[in-house]
UniProtKB/Swiss-Prot annotation:
Signal peptide: none annotated. Pathway: Cell wall biogenesis; peptidoglycan biosynthesis. GO terms for biological process: carbohydrate metabolic process; cell division; cell wall organization; lipid glycosylation; peptidoglycan biosynthetic process; regulation of cell shape. The keyword Cell inner membrane applies. It comes from the Bacteria. InterPro entries: GlcNAc_MurG (IPR006009), Glyco_trans_28_C (IPR007235), GlycoTrans_28_N (IPR004276). It catalyses: di-trans,octa-cis-undecaprenyl diphospho-N-acetyl-alpha-D-muramoyl-L-alanyl-D-glutamyl-meso-2,6-diaminopimeloyl-D-alanyl-D-alanine + UDP-N-acetyl-alpha-D-glucosamine = di-trans,octa-cis-undecaprenyl diphospho-[N-acetyl-alpha-D-glucosaminyl-(1->4)]-N-acetyl-alpha-D-muramoyl-L-alanyl-D-glutamyl-meso-2,6-diaminopimeloyl-D-alanyl-D-alanine + UDP + H(+). This is UDP-N-acetylglucosamine--N-acetylmuramyl-(pentapeptide) pyrophosphoryl-undecaprenol N-acetylglucosamine transferase.
Length: 355
């Protein structure tokens, strides 16, 4: 039996912030001979994405409870019980040595199912403040890890697994030291874009003129509108794209990033070694603010919360960052990164499987 490969079930779903770090760990362990299956939901992004990465996926039926009506809340215990039962049946068939919860609604019933079968549960919290599912599961988990300090008081800080092409970028000194000309500003609103970035940055471009050149990722369906906004501000020379397929190339091009502060974005910016101006998404638990705070404290970034993200404030901030300052901030960002996060998470999974 000792010669048989170890088996891991990854539980993650809903958003790229949960799924992509899970994929990084899965590939790392598969390269070492592990068998990996995924637990997800059929109507979220993991259903298409995970099989494209050569990983088989099983589905349970579960969704979030926030913002749902009274009827949905009353039915919630039944739905959670049914999802737990589905997850139990899947795990009885696959017989994982360990399950890894990377967040999303699927982790709740999946983690409870594993615990009820005596399968150890390992958790990774990507955000600076713990999600509801992970708060519950932490009580039964064999090991809890966090990307940023503060989500769990005693958990080890291991960073977020990021893509290898971002980790492979040259260090800031090699990339940025000899640059001249306009400051290259990369504006990223995520795959859905960010309305405040799309509305504010064309006016910032007009204010800063030849001092900057901008590459603006508008998000789905907003490219024409944002191009029009730059043209209306007499700034048609700036590049606007709906999506950026090669983020590593975009980071390599940039001198500074203006963006939301989702967990994966913050971790990628640190790994790339880039200064950032963050505008956290306004959420009641201020999750994105807490994600960005370590880089601001390190002197690698500035946070402007949405009410403060005005044309004046953004223009003055960018104007105040000369090339020497940007290079110093970039080096501080890289120093704050945890480039071996994937290996650290995989090591914890291996240790729990051996125990």
């Amino acid at each position: 039996m000792s010669g048989q490969p170890k088996r891991l079930m990854v539980m993650a779903g809903g958003t790229g912030g949960h799924v992509f770090p899970g994929l990084a760990v899965a590939h790392h362990l598969m390269a070492q001979g592990w068998q990996v299956r995924w637990l997800g939901t059929a109507d979220r992004m993991e259903a298409d994405l995970v099989p494209k990465h050569g990983i088989e996926i099983d589905f349970i039926r579960i969704s979030g409870l926030r913002g749902k009506g009274v009827k949905a809340l009353l039915l919630a215990p039944v739905r959670i019980f049914n999802a737990w039962r589905q997850a139990r049946a899947i795990m009885k068939r696959f017989k994982p040595d360990v399950v890894l919860g990377m967040g999303g609604y699927v982790s709740g019933p999946g983690g409870l199912a594993a615990w009820s079968l005596g399968i150890p549960v390992v958790l990774h919290e990507q955000n600076g403040i713990a999600g509801l599912t992970n708060k519950w599961l932490a009580k039964i988990a064999s090991r809890v890890m966090q990307a940023f300090p503060g989500a769990f008081p005693k958990a080890e800080v291991v960073g977020n697994p990021v893509r290898t092409d971002v980790l492979a970028l040259p260090l800031p000194q090699a990339r940025l030291a000899g640059r001249e000309g306009p400051v290259r500003v990369l504006v990223v609103g995520g795959s859905q874009g960010a309305r405040i970035l799309n509305q504010t940055m064309p006016q910032v471009a007009a204010r800063l003129g030849d001092a900057v050149t901008i590459w603006h990722q508008s998000g789905k369906g907003a490219q024409a509108e944002v191009q029009q906004a730059y043209a209306a501000a007499s700034q048609p020379q700036h590049k606007v794209t709906e999506f950026i397929d090669d983020m590593a190339a975009a980071y390599a091009w940039a001198d500074v990033v203006v963006c939301r502060s989702g967990a994966l974005t913050v971790s990628e910016i640190a790994a790339a070694g880039l200064p950032a101006l963050f505008v956290p998404f306004q959420h009641k638990d201020r999750q994105q603010y807490w994600n960005a705070l370590p880089l601001e404290k390190a002197g690698a970034a500035k946070i402007l919360e949405q009410p403060q993200f005005t044309v004046d404030a953004v223009s003055e901030t960018l104007k105040g960052w000369d090339r020497a300052t940007l290079l110093e901030m970039a080096e501080r960002a890289r120093a704050a990164a945890i480039p071996d996060a994937t290996e650290r998470v995989a090591d914890e999974v291996r240790a729990v499987a051996r125990a």
